[in-house]
């Protein structure tokens, strides 16, 4: 893939960016009553309004040129064809195959992966429905009331986000919990109030060697065995893994092991066996609807022209702000409490994918890549960090997401929520001029020095860019579309930046060093051999933990 800075479209965008400095968004809107019509797209019941961005028709044309010159279409097609686009690990990237219901073969190393996918989905359907119906019972014959998913990273963030997002579809009386942190507090607090007789554990680890996951799994096993005895493990544990030997040694019946493959990256794995807690929570039909929604977005991504392609547009806008307008962060702001874990999920999906400084050909990048992503559900964020977005010195593009129809239509709650959703995008776009602030203060009775002292604090610069994503309602299909939209956005940006979105070498170094430090914490006779700071902290840990 080419160095993007050598492309003519990149140079044209760099020359174009300064021309927008005297065209703030409020001016662009006032000059063009059809701006919304020109800069929004609808796909089924999902609408992307990108009109409140610092763009003109020329900007979007240049960004489309950049996409074509960067090979966005070719790399997209290579992914769907099963080519090993994860070059540092020599792997295909085929999470999209997991949600493809068509009979068209998908080949990896010459073999069609569709039959294996279908077999695992059938296994998931049978198991999840058995748990939900009460046909699956624990060692004492009681039905399962609580499912505890033990995983970390992609084995946790995706499933917990979806289970929370689809709580309106959950089976009453069947609770799904998630344990990820190796801090013993997490599993200790989760197990409080649970009954071993009615609890099922799902251990999610592809290799069945992940330190955090296996530490928590063994603690859960000890808790269960202490109450029900060793033979109970087989009725109260299932594994989402490929390591049959380790799963069996743990005491799990390999008939209750759900496989996935090395062409499924962790942060893209909720569509695989890792999604079993989703299927148990909301039912397999709703899990299938989630897959179908994602597949619909996959088809749109493959077939829509660049100028009308939702993931491409979102991705290019991110490149525009990061590389040409100096933005180093992005906010994702869902105005739906069910989406309260969306930002955390997208943090991993985006930052672990595109937090890279090395190109596909091993060179250090000379441009900005992935941004810091954060967010909170509205209106909580409004009373937290929106101050900085409105009046701070950093440019932070925002994605606002909301459903038009609430699952909980209580009084005026949803109308108030959506009025804030709409007001924030307008306020960030328009701002408040000094003249407007002066008139407002004067109308409140202020004058003279008091007015002049307060005036600068009441000015909002505006021109803060936002996308608004409005869906009809948050249901499994729509959620699948939304997640796939962001997955493909990430892919588009990685293509433009000429980086690998599908490895994560940055997580390795700390884990390697932790293995060396662990025995030094557990055995005071070992002399630590690190830098003075690390050695000093180890000494303090020994002092404090000794009592």
From Swiss-Prot:
One of its GO terms (cellular component) is cytosol. InterPro entries: G6P_Isomerase, G6P_Isomerase_C, Phosphoglucose_isomerase_CS, SIS_dom_sf, SIS_PGI_1, SIS_PGI_2. The keyword Transport does not apply. CDD domains: SIS_PGI_1, SIS_PGI_2. GO terms for molecular function: carbohydrate derivative binding; glucose-6-phosphate isomerase activity; monosaccharide binding. Gene3D superfamilies: 1.10.1390.10, Glucose-6-phosphate isomerase like protein, domain 1. It comes from the Bacteria. Keywords: Cytoplasm, Gluconeogenesis, Glycolysis, Isomerase. Its EC number is 5.3.1.9. GO terms for biological process: gluconeogenesis; glucose 6-phosphate metabolic process; glycolytic process. Its main location: cytoplasm. The keyword Cytoplasm applies. It is found in: Cytoplasm. Pfam families: PGI (PF00342). It is an enzyme of class 5 (isomerase). It catalyses: alpha-D-glucose 6-phosphate = beta-D-fructose 6-phosphate. PANTHER family: GLUCOSE-6-PHOSPHATE ISOMERASE (PTHR11469:SF1). Belongs to the GPI family. This is Glucose-6-phosphate isomerase. It comes from Rhodospirillum rubrum (strain ATCC 11170 / ATH 1.1.1 / DSM 467 / LMG 4362 / NCIMB 8255 / S1).
């Amino acid at each position: 893939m080419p160095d993007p800075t050598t492309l003519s479209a990149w140079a044209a965008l760099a020359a174009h960016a300064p021309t927008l400095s005297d065209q703030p968004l409020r001016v662009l809107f006032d000059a063009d009553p059809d701006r919304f019509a020109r800069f929004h797209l609808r796909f089924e019941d999902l609408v992307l309004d990108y009109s409140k961005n610092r763009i003109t028709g020329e900007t979007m044309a240049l960004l489309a040129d950049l996409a074509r010159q960067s090979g966005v279409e070719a790399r997209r097609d290579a992914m769907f064809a099963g080519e090993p686009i994860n070059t540092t690990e020599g792997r295909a990237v085929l999470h999209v195959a997991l949600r493809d219901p068509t009979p068209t073969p998908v080949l990896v190393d010459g073999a069609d992966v569709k039959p294996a996918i279908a077999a695992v989905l059938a296994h998931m359907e049978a198991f999840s429905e058995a748990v939900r119906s009460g046909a699956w019972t624990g060692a004492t014959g009681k039905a399962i009331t609580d499912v505890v998913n033990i995983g970390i990273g992609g084995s946790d963030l995706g499933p917990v986000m979806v289970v929370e997002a689809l709580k309106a579809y959950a089976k009453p009386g069947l609770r799904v919990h998630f344990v990820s942190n190796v801090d013993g507090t997490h599993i200790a607090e989760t197990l409080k109030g649970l009954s071993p007789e009615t609890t099922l554990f799902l251990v999610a680890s592809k290799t069945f060697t992940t330190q955090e996951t296996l530490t928590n799994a063994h603690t859960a096993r000890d808790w269960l065995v202490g109450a029900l005895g060793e033979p109970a493990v087989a009725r109260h544990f299932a594994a989402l893994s490929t390591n049959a030997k380790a799963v069996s040694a743990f005491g799990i019946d390999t008939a209750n092991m759900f496989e996935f493959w090395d062409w499924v990256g962790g942060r893209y794995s909720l569509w695989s066996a890792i999604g079993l807690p989703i299927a148990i929570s909301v039912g397999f039909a709703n899990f299938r609807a989630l897959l179908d929604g994602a597949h619909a977005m996959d088809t749109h991504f493959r077939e829509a022209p660049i100028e009308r392609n939702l993931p491409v547009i979102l991705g290019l806008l991110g490149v525009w702000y990061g590389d040409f307008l100096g933005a180093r962060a992005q906010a994702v702001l869902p105005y739906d409490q069910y989406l309260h874990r969306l930002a955390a999920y997208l943090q991993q999906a985006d930052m672990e994918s595109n937090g890279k400084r090395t190109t596909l050909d091993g060179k250090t990048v000379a441009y900005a890549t992935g941004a810091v992503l954060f967010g909170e559900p509205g209106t909580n964020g409004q009373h937290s960090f929106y101050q900085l977005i409105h009046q701070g010195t950093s440019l932070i593009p925002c994605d606002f997401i909301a459903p038009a129809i609430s699952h909980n239509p209580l009084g005026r709650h949803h109308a108030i929520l959506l009025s804030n959703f709409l007001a924030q995008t307008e306020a960030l776009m328009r701002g408040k001029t000094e003249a407007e602030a002066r008139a407002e203060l004067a109308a409140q009775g202020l004058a003279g020095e008091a007015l002049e002292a307060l005036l600068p604090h009441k000015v909002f610069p505006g021109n803060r860019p936002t996308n608004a994503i409005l869906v009809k309602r948050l249901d499994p299909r729509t959620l699948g579309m939304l997640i796939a939209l962001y997955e493909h956005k990430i892919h588009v940006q990685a293509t433009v930046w000429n980086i690998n979105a599908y490895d994560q070498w940055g997580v390795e170094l700390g884990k390697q060093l932790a293995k060396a430090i662990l025995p030094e914490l557990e055995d005071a006779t070992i002399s630590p051999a690190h830098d003075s700071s690390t050695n000093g902290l180890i000494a303090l840990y020994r002092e404090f933990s000794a009592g």
